[in-house]
Amino acid sequence: MLKIDKLLSAPHGIAPVLVRRAPKLVLPFAERSKSRLRAVLDNGDEAALFLARGTVLRGGDLLVAEDGSFVEVQAAAEAVLEVRAEDPHALMRAAYHLGNRHTPVEIGRDYLRLEYDAVLADMLQRLGVRAERAELPFEPEAGAYGGGHKHGHDATFAEDYAAAQAVFHEHHGHSHSHSHDHVHDEKCGHKH
């Protein structure tokens, strides 16, 4: 079994001839979002992935096995909804409502693409856009701060929170201290 623990994200600068010769790992988005995975390559070899937590593989990425060999990642065709509209406003409105539902979305120049969901297809059609089922590769946007969507205080919460705060402070122009310049005792007038 091929053990893989390194990722070279596209564009990686590896010679095209080496990429063409590499076996392919063809997976749908849900499988490309796992950091620990056993899979079969297109040449029949088995592979075990041990990647950093939160890693999302994209089509065109290269994996490096312990023996130094390369494996190219390809996004598998899967059931998706392809959303199109007659005008950009309608498409933006659809994107807004999908975002409100925390739905992973691939954003193209004139389309949105999401994992197939009959309920969302109905909602989108009620919004006045075309939502057609198709079998296509799915490459949704990464989270706003580089990771996936998180709820609660999981293993990467502190990192995600720090990244969000850094972006806020860059935009906001200054930081706020939470220290106090007085003694905390029963006479300070507030509870701690």
Curated annotation (Swiss-Prot):
GO biological process: protein folding; protein-containing complex assembly; urea metabolic process
Keywords: Chaperone, Cytoplasm, Nickel, Nickel insertion
Region: Disordered, residue numbers: 170-192
Residue ranges with Basic and acidic residues bias: 178-192
Residue ranges of coiled coil: none
Top-rank taxon, per record: Bacteria
UniProt GO cellular component terms: cytoplasm
Keyword check for Chaperone: yes
Main location: cytoplasm
InterPro entries in alphabetical order: UreE (IPR012406), UreE_C_dom (IPR007864), UreE_N (IPR004029), UreE_N_sf (IPR036118)
Protein purpose: Involved in urease metallocenter assembly. Binds nickel. Probably functions as a nickel donor during metallocenter assembly.
Name used for this protein in its record: Urease accessory protein UreE
Lineage start: Bacteria, Pseudomonadati, Pseudomonadota, Betaproteobacteria, Burkholderiales
Gene for this chain: ureE
